[in-house]
Amino acid sequence: MKILFVLISILHAVYCFSSEEDVDSAYLANELEPVEDINSEQYAALEPKEEHERSCADMGQDCKDDCDCCLNIATCNCWFGRYFCSCTFGDYQTCLRKKGKCKRNRPQSCPRSNLNRKKG
């Protein structure tokens, strides 16, 4: 099965390379006209600026401690002690802990679950 996969991969690579040469040779022989982008100047101002690093990490992104995670209830969960850390969902206690120790990305309010409240 592995050999079959390798053979198919090689055939696909050869096909892609040969079809690329056909397009290049046709272009050099003036059989294909180059496509001119009429609106290139119009969209020049709309190109995105370089992205700055965010001050907090979204769910699933790498983190070092709870204060790196964006959400109020997000916690930094690490495998094998301090390795392979990423932001995951926490709970109300996580929010309170972040409120006490974090100077940046400090939660303004901690959401409480409506499941435990008594009605009536």
Curated annotation (Swiss-Prot):
Disulfide bonds join 56-70, 63-76, 69-87, 78-85. Residues 17-54 form a propeptide. GO terms for cellular component: extracellular region. Expressed by the venom gland. Keywords: Disulfide bond, Knottin, Secreted, Signal, Toxin. Residues 56-95 form the Agouti domain. The keyword Flavoprotein does not apply. Residues 1-16 form the signal peptide. Coiled coil: none annotated. Belongs to the neurotoxin 05 (agouti) family. The presence of a 'disulfide through disulfide kOR' structurally defines this protein as a knottin. This is U13-lycotoxin-Ls1a. It comes from Lycosa singoriensis. The lineage of its organism: Eukaryota, Metazoa, Ecdysozoa, Arthropoda, Chelicerata.
